[in-house]
């Protein structure tokens, strides 16, 4: 499992001109799932993200988690994170999980994030989405389970 995490001042996701998920402050997650991922990977990443200290304390040191800051999460499925661009000019997506399996694991992952005590908004799995955010910092990290 691969997640691109962005500390966000605000974020939203729109499908067909309608906002389907929106947060005022917290983390925007682009979530990629490969065919080798399991529920164990999803739980590991959910716990890691909820407790990752990437928000500044009063002295400017990254010392607080999204939980500490009472932030929210906007989670967006993104199979293109497993695009392989090493050969040719078109990405190969063979490492991305098949949609049925990926959707199950994506839903499970979001529930695991909720179990950590976070409010989670989502995009629409498999849809073409427009994602808008103000990246705070900017702070952008890649979190992987393997």
UniProtKB/Swiss-Prot annotation:
| Location in the cell | Cytoplasm
Checking InterPro entries in the record gives: Daa-tRNA_deacyls_DTD, DTD-like_sf
Q: Provide the top EC class.
A: hydrolase
Q: Which Gene3D superfamilies match?
A: D-tyrosyl-tRNA(Tyr) deacylase (3.50.80.10)
- Where is the short sequence motif Gly-cisPro motif, important for rejection of L-amino acids located? 137-138
Q: Which reaction does it catalyse?
A: glycyl-tRNA(Ala) + H2O = tRNA(Ala) + glycine + H(+); a D-aminoacyl-tRNA + H2O = a tRNA + a D-alpha-amino acid + H(+)
Q: Name one Pfam family in it.
A: Tyr_Deacylase
- Highest taxon in the source lineage: Bacteria
UniProt keyword Cytoplasm, yes or no? yes
Q: Might you give the EC number(s) for this enzyme?
A: 3.1.1.96
Keyword field: Cytoplasm, Hydrolase, RNA-binding, tRNA-binding
- UniProt keyword tRNA-binding present: yes
Q: What is said about its interaction partners and assembly?
A: Homodimer.
Q: Which family does it belong to?
A: Belongs to the DTD family.
Q: What is known of its domains?
A: A Gly-cisPro motif from one monomer fits into the active site of the other monomer to allow specific chiral rejection of L-amino acids.
NCBIfam families in the record, alphabetically? D-aminoacyl-tRNA deacylase
Q: What is this protein called?
A: D-aminoacyl-tRNA deacylase
**Source species:** Bacillus mycoides (strain KBAB4) (Bacillus weihenstephanensis)
Q: Coding gene?
A: dtd
């Amino acid at each position: 499992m691969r997640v691109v995490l962005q500390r966000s001042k605000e974020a939203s996701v729109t499908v067909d001109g309608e906002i389907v998920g929106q947060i005022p402050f917290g983390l925007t997650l682009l979530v990629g799932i490969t065919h080798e991922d399991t529920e164990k990977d999803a739980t590991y990443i959910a716990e890691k993200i909820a407790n990752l200290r990437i928000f500044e304390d009063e002295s400017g040191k990254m010392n607080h988690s999204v939980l500490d800051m009472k932030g929210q999460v906007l989670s967006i499925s993104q199979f293109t994170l497993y695009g392989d661009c090493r050969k040719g000019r078109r990405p190969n997506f063979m490492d991305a999980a098949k949609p049925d399996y990926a959707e199950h694991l994506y839903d499970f992952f979001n529930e695991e994030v909720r179990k950590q005590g976070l409010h989670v908004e989502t995009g629409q799995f498999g849809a073409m989405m427009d994602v808008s955010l103000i990246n705070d910092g900017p702070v952008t990290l890649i979190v992987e389970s393997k």
